[in-house]
Amino acid sequence: SCLLADAGFVAVQDNTASAGNYSSNRPKEKQRLFRSTAVEKEIARVQKLLKNRKLSWMFANCFPNTLDTTVHFRKGSDGKPDTFVYTGDIHAMWLRDSGAQVWPYVQLANNDPKLKEMLAGVILRQFKCINIDPYANAYNDGALPDGHWMSDLTDMKPELHERKWEIDSLCYPLRLAYHYWQVTGDTSVFGAEWLEAIRNIYTTFCQQQRKEGVGPYKFQRKTERALDTLNNDGLGAPVRPVGLIVSCFRPSDDATTLQFLVPSNFFAVTSLRKAAEILETVNKETALAADCRALADEVEMALKRYATYNHPEFGTIYAFEVDGFGNHLLMDDANVPSLLAMPYLGDVDVNDPIYQNTRRFVWSDSNPYFFSGKAGEGIGGPHIGYDMVWPMSIMMKAFTSRDDAEIKTCIKMLMDTDAGTGFMHESFNKNDPKNFTRAWFAWQNTLFGELILKLVNEGKVDLLNSIQ
């Protein structure tokens, strides 16, 4: 099940590490899609600090992977930067993936004007995508009338790669734009396109509270994959309108079971508050800012009331999904936003006792999608299925850890499950890392680089260098 998606990119990966020869697995310099002096300097700086040759090699392969292989930067017809970001082996732009893929480069934007311009291009492209259709999760680079999912039973358009309604698709662009603004002070991205996008986001969130009926969105697909379509004539399972927002699909692109997806509702709260701050400070749009804050407050109150469950072993925990009727789905999926990742996104405090209980629950065999085997352990999900651990979950355990020994175990496990390629994969079999999916998955590669860089910047070089 090793999916070799792009022969030019991955063909030579497998022999380098096994021979102890850690030569770069990056594309040749001429073939790299985007080059950043600041990113190259940062790679050189970190590599000098890391004594473990394999870890140093993996960092250098992974951290620039989004820039090397997925970033298509150009100027739009309006003269503004426009950046279309592939997810990797699928040549479409997910709002979630693209927002996460370029995130760790924002901290370097002030050292590299070209990088800063490219990032502004991602933000502007995301706003454009939202204004094409705020219900979509992935977009084409222009209109493709014979696109892959044009036959889906939903309001498809040729500009859309896929039209699965996922709350987090509208949160990641807000997170990225706010972070970019905080780091660079650049307000040029917050023009007319932004105001239209945030109005679309606000309206879509309100529609999917389903207080005024079921709203305009339906989705069905002819498929053998049960979680690629919605029941009840494309509306999904019923919800009671208690103030939470429906997410028909998860960040894994799988259908929700109960449609109030808890981690994504937490993400909506913080994202709306960030949007409100931009609207107030940059645009002087005080009324819309107040609307965003009021919606955030309402969702937050509903989460306090409906999102927790009193577990017999772990105490009060956050459920993964609820429906407002009193039903709770107790599990976690590796894709972010997840229950495990909530402090990473800044949506809950890592010291919140309910979160800590939840963290113990999701990393245990009480979570139906927690897998542990000879090669490693972690959380997967129904997207790939039984026994397949997603490295993303191991990274999120490290990102949210307060324990150096735990962080070290996570990094070692990530290093030991690359199947000799020097890259992260979507998932690997718990007993055999050579049995993996997606050889070219830029989000997880760049996220690994982000994690190592964070640990270096937090003074944990000695911890990383103690890994054998």
Model-derived features: where do they sit?
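Extended, well-ordered alpha-helical scaffold segments
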Residues: M58, P113-C129, T187-C206, A275, ...
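Acidic, low-complexity proline/glycine-rich segments
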Residues: D14-Q31, D228-L244, S466
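Active-site-adjacent bridging/hinge elements
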Residues: L67-P81, L144-L153, P238-R250, A419-E426
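Aromatic-rich carbohydrate-recognition surfaces in CAZymes
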Residues: H91-L119, I123-L227, A442-V456
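Well-ordered alpha-helical scaffold segments within catalytic/enzyme domains
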Residues: A38-K51, A100-P113, Y172-T187, F266-E285, ...
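Low-complexity, Ser/Thr/Pro/Gly-enriched N-terminal "stalk/linker" regions
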Residues: C2, D6-R96
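Extended ligand-binding clefts on enzyme/binding-domain cores
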Residues: L95, N131-Y135, Y139-G142, H148, ...
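C-terminal capping/lid segments that line or modulate ligand- or cofactor-binding pockets
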Residues: D152-P158, R163-E166, L329-D349, D387-Q468
